[in-house]
Amino acid sequence: MTCTSAFIKVVRFIQVVIDTREIRSLCTIRMQVESLQNLQAKIRNDERNHSLTKKYLTDDIVKKYQATKTSLGGTLAQCVNTNAYNPGALLPRSCDLNAYETFRDFFDAVIADYHKVPDGKIQHPKSNFGDLKSLSFTDLNTYGNLVVSTRVRLGRTVEGFGFGPTLTKETRIELENKISTALHNLSGEYEGTYYPLTGMSEEDRIKLVNDHFLFRNDDNVLRDAGGYIDWPTGRGIFINKQKNFLVWINEEDHIRVISMQKGGDLIAVYKRLADAIQELSKSLKFAFNDRLGFITFCPSNLGTTLRASVHAKIPMLASLPNFKEICEKHGIQPRGTHGEHTESVGGIYDLSNKRRLGLTELDAVTEMHSGVRALLELEVMLQEYNKGAPEGVMPVEPLTYLAKLLEGASIEKCYTRKYLTPEIIKKYDGKRTTHGATLAHMIRNGAYNNRSICPRTGEAECYSTFIDYLDPLICDYHGVKDSAFKHPAPTFGDLSKLPFGDLDPTGKFIVSTRVRVGRSVEDFLFPTIMSKTDRIKLEQVISGALKGLTGEHAGTYYPLTDMKEEDRKQLVEDHFLFKNDDPVLRDAGGYRDWPVGRGIFHNNSKTFLVWVCEEDHMRIISMQQGGNLAAVYKRLIEGINAIGKSMKFAHSDKYGYITCCPSNLGTSMRASVLLKIPKLSSQPKKLDEICAKYMLQARGLYGEHTESPDGTYDISNKRRLGLTELQAAHEMAEGVAKMIEIEKGL
């Protein structure tokens, strides 16, 4: 006896009429999941998980909703289950159409964040596809013939039915029948055939696969959200005769209505979709909410649910390190060739509008057209500007294009912009070094990060090829007054008779001391433009030398590629692991091929550390707790000398040691202490005066561009060029001693 028939007998017995929707609710065999508390713990404890679910699934939310159910029996645990098992999944999924209101405090926070809702006030206008007779979009293949196909789709939920976690097999079939009947009634260009997945013939299956129409059950995120329960029952595909109109039934949403065709004629595709959905609305009632718009399984699709997209050939644009950020700037979301969570094939990407909530359908498709047009125009520029570039070198936007973006930077604070004059642009536009580095490569990080101070070079040759740009910049940054400057020869001093010792014998002010230098290996390009092959070769050269160190410097090398989880956790705990999260270095090309060719070496006592292929080929670091600068400095110099026996460092009589960033030229040394100066730091003007007088640089506790609320600052020497290593360390020591003296007196 079925659940429904048993219930109806009870109904007849007590002579009560119950709505069929209530029967569905009471008889649902729901997706079984762990408790909300357990799922929250899994999400919270997974450091790979950076989802909005993790952000907003607070203890208060769990407490409030742990026993709450929707009218269809759905739970918040069902909504967040997929995030517990897929750390890369950004969003929860709604268990049914009522979940957004039942769990409103949770979902509203997620929705407002994802859709960038101003002031968190969620609202959505009435549906408006515009006047379909007067659309004015240009064909997107006008811009370089790069568009392979155009596609516009939207999702719809039929009122009265749950989503995957709360649908029974019987109601899923009922829903399928309801939708397929409406589709069979379509006429004209929409007339077609419905193919249920259950019992599908092999001939039909092969045909649908060949046409790329068949959806599958291989998405882990959708699976763990309950999207594949009872697969393939209740699911199917409708296709019109021209194969340019398609409807998926019970894939993620109840229906996905899709209009598509080859080429870039967005008007034809959009009009076909709009006419069809208006026709289907006559026989199907779609769930709509005045705040959220049309209701969908995933919060990302709320609102219009409309996703207008093209498959476009953009290999150069897609290879840029900040490709996703460029797309986001233009309101576009990039995906792989075969959809979300897939890779691109042959440089072809799916580009679609990102915004769906808070605007009309016409607004959404207009934004998509404008954004895609801008990206296609940029791809055309990239292809033209990078003709003849050496293989493996990162493509780069035209110098004039980046110079325009750089205008947003402060001409007083940004050296990159200050010296990029019209004359310099004219002189160096299109010029390359022997291995393909351009001035455009160098200024790119500043163009996209206007707070960045200095350019990044691609190889040592940049300093001679672009000398008229770099030399004035270098003189200004390093305070060098003579344009014919020459850096002194390396001088580390007598390590047994150093002019400084422990800067804080009492231990009251200095938390730790650290001295580092950058080194480039001769005949290798810098990490910003280096090829993957050379990156691996360089890592082998450096790691081989490090593994040969002895005595106090002997230790272990940890390559970032295929790093063991236990090693990764230990390096994180020790604060040794460098990451790929600096947008300035990213946009200079510093994270290309990540994590290939990179690694970390540290000695057994964890006081000597080498970063391989972060910004420079090597960052060699000596450090320890307390203020004993002499011990830290001595360890560093002895380590540098030992490594230098196995390779030749890039060095110039003019610039000293050659580094990726001009700020590190010369000694490339940064000697620093973590200094507790709460009284002095509460007087920013006085702190700045001391730093200026003693040529020091003060950074926040977490590095450059950060604050220090507790008064602990990273204090380091500012000068690196025009003085010896010994002088640089001594300069820092004298300045720190003065700061401690002032702090004591306040």
Curated annotation (Swiss-Prot):
<feature type="binding site">
    <location>
        <begin position="335"/>
        <end position="340"/>
    </location>
    <ligand>
        <name>ATP</name>
    </ligand>
</feature>
<feature type="binding site">
    <location>
        <position position="619"/>
    </location>
    <ligand>
        <name>ATP</name>
    </ligand>
</feature>
<feature type="binding site">
    <location>
        <begin position="699"/>
        <end position="704"/>
    </location>
    <ligand>
        <name>ATP</name>
    </ligand>
</feature>
<feature type="repeat" description="Approximate">
    <location>
        <begin position="31"/>
        <end position="393"/>
    </location>
</feature>
<feature type="active site">
    <location>
        <position position="298"/>
    </location>
</feature>
<feature type="active site">
    <location>
        <position position="661"/>
    </location>
</feature>
<dbReference type="GO" id="GO:0005524">
    <property type="term" value="F:ATP binding"/>
</dbReference>
<feature type="domain" description="Phosphagen kinase N-terminal 1">
    <location>
        <begin position="35"/>
        <end position="116"/>
    </location>
</feature>
<dbReference type="GO" id="GO:0005615">
    <property type="term" value="C:extracellular space"/>
</dbReference>
<comment type="similarity">
    <text>Belongs to the ATP:guanido phosphotransferase family.</text>
</comment>
<feature type="domain" description="Phosphagen kinase N-terminal 2">
    <location>
        <begin position="398"/>
        <end position="479"/>
    </location>
</feature>
<keyword id="KW-0808">Transferase</keyword>
<dbReference type="GO" id="GO:0046314">
    <property type="term" value="P:phosphocreatine biosynthetic process"/>
</dbReference>
<keyword id="KW-0418">Kinase</keyword>
<keyword id="KW-0560">Oxidoreductase</keyword>
<feature type="domain" description="Phosphagen kinase C-terminal 1">
    <location>
        <begin position="146"/>
        <end position="382"/>
    </location>
</feature>
<dbReference type="Pfam" id="PF00217">
    <property type="entry name" value="ATP-gua_Ptrans"/>
</dbReference>
<keyword id="KW-0460">Magnesium</keyword>
<dbReference type="GO" id="GO:0050324">
    <property type="term" value="F:taurocyamine kinase activity"/>
</dbReference>
<dbReference type="GO" id="GO:0016491">
    <property type="term" value="F:oxidoreductase activity"/>
</dbReference>
<dbReference type="GO" id="GO:0046872">
    <property type="term" value="F:metal ion binding"/>
</dbReference>
<feature type="binding site">
    <location>
        <position position="256"/>
    </location>
    <ligand>
        <name>ATP</name>
    </ligand>
</feature>
<dbReference type="Pfam" id="PF02807">
    <property type="entry name" value="ATP-gua_PtransN"/>
</dbReference>
<feature type="binding site">
    <location>
        <begin position="149"/>
        <end position="153"/>
    </location>
    <ligand>
        <name>ATP</name>
    </ligand>
</feature>
<dbReference type="InterPro" id="IPR022415">
    <property type="entry name" value="ATP-guanido_PTrfase_AS"/>
</dbReference>
<dbReference type="GO" id="GO:0004111">
    <property type="term" value="F:creatine kinase activity"/>
</dbReference>
<keyword id="KW-0285">Flavoprotein</keyword>
<dbReference type="InterPro" id="IPR000749">
    <property type="entry name" value="ATP-guanido_PTrfase"/>
</dbReference>
<dbReference type="InterPro" id="IPR036802">
    <property type="entry name" value="ATP-guanido_PTrfase_N_sf"/>
</dbReference>
<keyword id="KW-0677">Repeat</keyword>
<dbReference type="InterPro" id="IPR022414">
    <property type="entry name" value="ATP-guanido_PTrfase_cat"/>
</dbReference>
<feature type="binding site">
    <location>
        <position position="212"/>
    </location>
    <ligand>
        <name>ATP</name>
    </ligand>
</feature>
<feature type="binding site">
    <location>
        <position position="575"/>
    </location>
    <ligand>
        <name>ATP</name>
    </ligand>
</feature>
<dbReference type="InterPro" id="IPR022413">
    <property type="entry name" value="ATP-guanido_PTrfase_N"/>
</dbReference>
<feature type="binding site">
    <location>
        <begin position="670"/>
        <end position="674"/>
    </location>
    <ligand>
        <name>ATP</name>
    </ligand>
</feature>
<dbReference type="InterPro" id="IPR014746">
    <property type="entry name" value="Gln_synth/guanido_kin_cat_dom"/>
</dbReference>
<feature type="domain" description="Phosphagen kinase C-terminal 2">
    <location>
        <begin position="509"/>
        <end position="746"/>
    </location>
</feature>
<keyword id="KW-0547">Nucleotide-binding</keyword>
<protein>
    <recommendedName>
        <fullName>Taurocyamine kinase</fullName>
        <ecNumber>2.7.3.4</ecNumber>
    </recommendedName>
</protein>
<feature type="binding site">
    <location>
        <begin position="307"/>
        <end position="311"/>
    </location>
    <ligand>
        <name>ATP</name>
    </ligand>
</feature>
<keyword id="KW-0067">ATP-binding</keyword>
<keyword id="KW-0479">Metal-binding</keyword>
